[in-house]
Amino acid sequence: MRRALEQLLGTEPVTERFVEDLWPAGLMAVRAGAERKPALVVRPGDVEGVSRVLRWASREGVTVTPLGGGSGVCGAINRTAGELLLDLGALSAFDIDESDLVVRAGAGVNGLVLEQALNDRGLTLGHFPSSLPVATVGGLIATRSSGQQSSYHGNIEDLVLGLSVVLPDGTVATARKPARSAVGPALHELFVGSEGAFGIVVEAVLAARRLPAMVAGRGVSFPTLGAGLGAMREVMQRDLRPLVMRLYDVEDTAFQSSEAEGCLLVVAVAGEPEVAGAQARVLDRILAGASQLGEAPWQAWLEHRFRLSAERMRRLLEAPASYLDTIEVAACWSALEALHADVKAGLAAEGAALCHFSHATPQGCCAYFTFAGSAPTEEAAAQAHRRAWTAAMDACDRHGATIGHHHGAGSARAPWIEREMGEWLQVWKAIHAALDPVAIMNPRALGGRR
């Protein structure tokens, strides 16, 4: 296979190397002694190179998985023998139209590099997942990501104006004009969250915004989780647009702050001073019953918001027979408090568990759980980790919650995909069969082929 690819692209773009994402179950397996094998990786220099590789793979029946920054936590690139990884890192060019606020970025563009380039021009993408320093534009799109300022800027699907995609047979579908169109459905949206199952995103057309003229953040605390969730719901249902709004449960509050008691809420407003000031006054009324903590919690959050880096995640999982993971789910406001109690009970039965709430909309928000523990042996730790996931996924089913908000599906959520999607899984299968009849694209996308 390597020889065929070298004949196709030359020797330089084809390498063998160890490739891992940040899926805790995969890292735990390696720690327990699972054999690590180098992957065959091809790194085309341009879109035509991607097209040639996929044409060849379709002809030869070789499985291909796109590779971005490797910051995924759900095992979407946990390949098996005989597969090919297609590294998109060479597609790293981008162009910023400061008049129309339109960005064209290759799939391999680093998220933080793009954001800093926009900031230099007084602009922002407004998309700040915690993986931003490592993640690529293509990966953010493929996993249907959401950022820390999503209540203000929207999720990745709200920022994508168009996509250029290479289909499994090598056809290049170029992005349409960025203006909204009613000439057929927005078919590029099929690829947002597809985890590389339908083809490979090679370029994105994205909506930028001007940096806000003013940002003002602070912290308050509530005696109960219910009171904090009620305040978040009131903020969103009054049509305010907070830049950031994050509520921590009692255990996570104790972890985040030595000053706050109860449940900490970090909230910020942004925009033109007159607009942000008006929103701040409405926030004052809604949060009047909470304990006021000033700007310190906001500043602390800003300083540490990207602290769970890829290397830190790996270091935390070095301890023998330990586990650490995150599960992000989402539900409507009426279900969130009961969902939280149910998931926490399942996770805490195996170890320690924390939760914060963010990505709020008028209908509900994301509940983001972090859990950790240890066991006498590696196998016992793996079993405890699996039980924790099962408990969380079953709780979502009981409370009408979605099992994944912004990390994607991959291998981690494979056992629960059919229950989550219902009849829509048949729609997925039909589209997949039409676009990829040879079935060469990422076999772990959306939990794997069925």
Region roles according to the model:
Residues 1-55, 72-101, 250-256, 299-324, ...:
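N-terminal flexible segment immediately upstream of the FAD-binding catalytic core
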Residues 17-29, 210, 216, 221, ...:
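C-terminal substrate-recognition/cap domain of FAD-linked oxidoreductases
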Residues 68-71, 91, 130, 247-250, ...:
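Short, ordered loop/turn segments at secondary-structure junctions
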Residues 92-246:
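FAD-binding subdomain of flavoenzyme oxidoreductases
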Residues 410-450:
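Activity-critical C-terminal alpha-helical subdomain
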